[in-house]
């Protein structure tokens, strides 16, 4: 087992793993230990009251955080005609059809999000083995297959996060940067949780949001008292 660094020992000593912190206190703890030489991301893990083995209880979707994520996002769009012009005007970094597909087949993957209009899926479908494993395959459930590509581009650029539970029924995503104010991070977390509640499967019973923890890229997890949200 790898030895803990002095920094990680200090972080672990400063976080009470048995306690659920009030949100402002939780954020203060994160900021206290966010001492890396870069602006660390603030990530969230949400334990859901679902049975991930049942397909009708899996949760997947996307929402735009009111204060963004602090990340610069490059967007590729598969579309044509007037939609291509609209996508470019909305800020898309790459727009095309077969030409864009050829770039991707050659390994040119300089983007973070892929959006497609429905008529372009015949082209995108050929890229499943490349885009799928990277979590980049467009999907209507998260709004990346849409006739309104311009709005999808704007959402991606303005702080949209996509979420999907893992095999343990936990959602992992980001809600901003350590440099964000406590208010901005709280608003982003509230927006994410509201989106998750709306996405609750009808077959899920009992408490839906069971636990919420936040952490920075290089820090320990801090449990959040949901009553403080």
UniProtKB/Swiss-Prot annotation:
InterPro entries, per the entry: Ribosom_uL1_bac-type (IPR005878), Ribosomal_uL1 (IPR002143), Ribosomal_uL1-like (IPR023674), Ribosomal_uL1/biogenesis (IPR028364), Ribosomal_uL1_3-a/b-sand (IPR016095), Ribosomal_uL1_CS (IPR023673)
GO molecular function: rRNA binding; structural constituent of ribosome; tRNA binding
Keywords tagged on the record: Repressor, Ribonucleoprotein, Ribosomal protein, RNA-binding, rRNA-binding, Translation regulation, tRNA-binding
Gene Ontology terms: biological process: regulation of translation; translation
Record's GO cellular component terms: cytosolic large ribosomal subunit
Gene3D superfamilies assigned to the protein according to its UniProt record, in alphabetical order: 3.30.190.20, 3.40.50.790
Pfam families in UniProt: Ribosomal_L1 (PF00687)
Subunit structure comment from the entry: Part of the 50S ribosomal subunit.
Family per similarity comment: Belongs to the universal ribosomal protein uL1 family.
NCBIfam families reported in the protein's UniProt record: rplA_bact
Matches recorded under HAMAP family: Ribosomal_uL1_B
Its biological purpose: Binds directly to 23S rRNA. The L1 stalk is quite mobile in the ribosome, and is involved in E site tRNA release. Protein L1 is also a translational repressor protein, it controls the translation of the L11 operon by binding to its mRNA.
Official protein name in the record: Large ribosomal subunit protein uL1
Organism field: Mannheimia succiniciproducens (strain KCTC 0769BP / MBEL55E)
